[in-house]
């Protein structure tokens, strides 16, 4: 059992136990749904589509029902390779500011979405900013003023790919990081305990690194 298989199978089993053990209502957000979480805050579900959700459910059932060990591992590997693009894609709107949160989606996971639906002021790039995280055409459609990349400073798994960061910087977006990898210009964000964004009316938006207490 490889470390990759072990990690993914453990995650699936943990999630399955969580679902089976909860007695509270469970909701399945699908593309097209709108949720008003509070005054002035609207959440639109862009993905996954109903067809994608059903395909994922079918793949999971087939995996757990598979009796042949060889076929089981093959199904597991196929599901692992595809799982990121079943991520929940959310568009938040607050007082004129749009925030796009694509989960772990890479550039292949936006298929079927109208480019106009992706436009956002703040964009959290998917797949930790790996090279396949977003395409030039998608960045053009999103046209973000600011981009957040959640990546470790040691760039494990090739996260915060320099070419992707340069492409987003060239689009005119300001880059922010949850950790401290260098940006395309070589500048390193200050050490910080958190990254916050303050969003106000009329598109007002400011990103701030919260310093580490002495």
PLM features per residue range, with description:
Residues 52-160:
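Active-site-proximal loop/helix segments of hydrolase catalytic cores
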Residues 150-151, 170-172:
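A general structural signal for short secondary-structure boundary/capping elements
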Residues 1-100, 173-174, 178-181, 185-214:
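Flexible, acidic/histidine-containing loops and adjacent segments that form or flank the divalent-metal
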Residues 142, 159-171, 180:
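Active-site-proximal loop/helix of nucleotide/amide-processing enzymes and allied scaffolds
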Residues 9-16, 111-114, 136-139, 162-168:
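Short amphipathic alpha-helical segments and helix-helix/interface helices
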């Amino acid at each position: 059992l490889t470390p990759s298989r072990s990690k993914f199978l453990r995650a699936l089993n943990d999630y399955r136990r969580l679902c089976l053990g909860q007695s509270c209502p469970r909701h399945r957000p699908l593309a097209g749904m709108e949720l008003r979480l509070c005054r002035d805050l609207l959440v639109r579900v862009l993905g996954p589509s109903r067809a994608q959700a059903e395909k994922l459910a079918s793949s999971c059932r087939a995996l757990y029902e598979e009796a042949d060990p060889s076929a089981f591992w093959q199904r597991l590997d196929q599901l692992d390779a595809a799982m990121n693009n079943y991520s929940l894609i959310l568009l938040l709107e607050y007082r004129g500011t749009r925030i796009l949160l694509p989960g772990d989606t890479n550039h292949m996971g936006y298929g079927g979405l109208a480019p106009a639906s992706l436009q956002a002021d703040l964009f959290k790039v998917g797949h930790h900013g790996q090279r396949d995280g977003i395409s030039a055409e998608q960045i053009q459609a999103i046209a973000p003023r600011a981009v957040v990349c959640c990546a470790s400073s040691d760039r494990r798994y090739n996260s915060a790919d320099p070419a992707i960061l340069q492409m987003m910087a060239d689009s005119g977006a300001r880059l922010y990081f949850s950790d401290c990898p260098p940006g395309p210009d070589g500048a390193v964000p200050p050490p910080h305990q958190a990254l916050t964004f303050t969003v106000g009316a009329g598109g007002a938006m400011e990103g701030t690194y919260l310093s580490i207490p002495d």
